[in-house]
Design a protein with these regions (language model features):
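Cleavable N-terminal export/targeting peptides
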Residues: 1-26
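A general lysine-centric signal
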Residues: 2-6, 138, 186
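Gram-negative (and chloroplast) outer-membrane scaffold detector with strong preference
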Residues: 24, 35-37, 69-154, 178
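Transmembrane beta-strand segments that form the barrel wall of outer-membrane beta-barrel proteins
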Residues: 29-31, 83, 139-142, 186-193
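Surface-exposed strand-loop-strand hairpins of Gram-negative outer-membrane beta-barrel proteins
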Residues: 36-68, 160-168
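Extracellular loop and loop/strand-boundary signature of outer-membrane beta-barrel proteins
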Residues: 54-60, 105-112, 154-164, 197-205
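Residues that define the transmembrane beta-barrel architecture of outer-membrane proteins
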Residues: 55, 65-69, 115-119, 166-172, ...
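Predominantly the C-terminal beta-signal and adjacent terminal strand-loop region
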Residues: 92-94, 172, 178-206
Length: 206
């Protein structure tokens, strides 16, 4: 998997634990709605029937989009800058491709990959234009679990087994926020580029 481009349309939170110095300073918790566009690329070096045949290289690139929700907690300083953590529960498929096995065993093998439970740690250096409106840059690190899987349409076709693996990505973006009483709204554009997942399967594929 190569990268995920993430555009957050809106984010609403309830601000708590504010101080008398600045009504926006303190701990905030809330929920976010995100509209995602992602692109993934992958390749597999297959060793043929039961791991003993000639090696072949299968490559694919996939793009997609989706809408997700997340929860977050963050702390804002009196100047307006913020540190926080964002968490998404669940999993989603990010790519699928098929190949045809021939020889002593024949059939179609479908490989897919899913990601689950993304968690992002972030900072938002902020410039407050006035008392209620600010703009910021955002950067952070995101951890996700990659879950590859292979299935075959025939019982005599040997499939590979891959391990789930946690990988990290670097997130960057820009945004703006607006405060209304003890509430605030954010609009952001973010991009995250992840590490490459690599693994040698139980049959020698990788």
């Amino acid at each position: 998997m190569k990268n995920i481009k993430k555009a957050i349309i809106s984010m609403i939170a309830i601000v708590g634990l504010s101080t008398n110095v600045n009504a926006f300073e303190g701990l905030s918790v809330g929920a976010a709605y995100s509209s995602l566009d992602f692109s993934t690329s992958g390749s597999e070096v297959a060793r043929g029937a039961e791991g003993g045949g000639a090696m072949t290289v299968n490559k694919t690139t996939k793009t997609g989009s989706g809408d997700i929700g997340s929860i977050f907690a963050e702390y804002s300083f009196a100047q307006g800058s913020t540190i926080g953590i964002d968490y998404i529960s669940g999993s989603t498929e990010i790519g699928k491709a098929s190949r045809t096995e021939a020889g002593t065993t024949s059939g179609t093998v479908t490989a897919s990959a899913a990601i689950s439970n993304p968690m992002t740690f972030y900072v938002e250096p902020t410039y407050m234009v006035n008392d209620v409106f600010g703009v910021y840059v955002k950067t952070g690190a995101t951890s996700i679990t990659v879950q590859p899987k292979e299935v075959a349409d025939a019982g005599n076709v040997v499939t590979s087994t891959y391990k789930d693996k946690d990988i990290w990505g670097i997130m960057t973006g820009v945004g703006a926020k607006y405060y209304v009483g003890n509430f605030f709204v954010k609009a952001e554009y973010l991009e995250t580029e992840f590490q490459t997942y690599t693994h040698t399967s139980t049959t020698g594929d990788k």
